[in-house]
Regions:
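Terminal catalytic/cofactor-binding subdomain
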Residues: 1-108, 117
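Internal, well-ordered domain-core segments that constitute the primary functional module
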Residues: 92-153
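Flexible helix-coil linker/hinge segments at domain or subdomain boundaries
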Residues: 70-77, 145-156
Length: 156
């Protein structure tokens, strides 16, 4: 049984100026939030098996798609293929406005593009315990290419 089935959304926040949901928390599962360019971020709880993560991400996407009721399109791309370079800031949070001003002062680093156009999967592989940390680090180094292969250009 999925964690989503045992969970009720217990916190929903939205930006009143845009009416966008900015944070949804599912107990024991993780957070679903919107990034400055409208990207969706899922910060999951830790999982022992990849299949459990995939199952819960799939169910989370279904919840988002149902909530969007056909009003939004979800793309599975690392970069927005249709946005113009001057893509407006979707979420008018103060921190994103501060970041925009900073990145615009250093256009050579393309920070505004990163904030508004890009999306990625960030996989965290944790080391449990200090006694065998060297073996754990070596295992993580072996798993990095596999992890990249699993998530490159993936819906997950």
């Amino acid at each position: 049984m999925s964690d989503f089935e045992n969970s009720t959304p217990i916190k929903i926040k939205y930006d009143e100026s845009s009416s966008l949901i900015t944070d949804v928390f599912f107990k024991h599962v993780g957070n679903i939030s919107a990034e400055p360019g409208g990207q969706i971020e899922f910060s999951s709880a830790p999982y022992e098996r990849l299949s459990d993560l995939v199952e819960n991400v799939t169910k989370g996407l279904k919840i988002l798609e149902e909530a969007a009721a056909g009003e939004l399109v979800f793309l599975s791309h690392g970069i927005n293929p249709i946005a113009k370079e001057n893509h407006p800031l979707v979420l008018p949070k103060e921190r994103y406005q501060i970041m925009t001003r900073y990145f615009e002062s250093a256009p050579h680093i393309r920070g505004v593009d990163m904030m508004r156009h890009s999306a990625t999967v960030q996989a965290n592989l944790d080391i449990f315990g200090d006694e065998n940390w060297q073996d754990a680090v070596n295992l993580i180094l072996v798993l990095v290419p596999l992890t990249q292969g699993l998530f490159a250009n993936s819906r997950f």
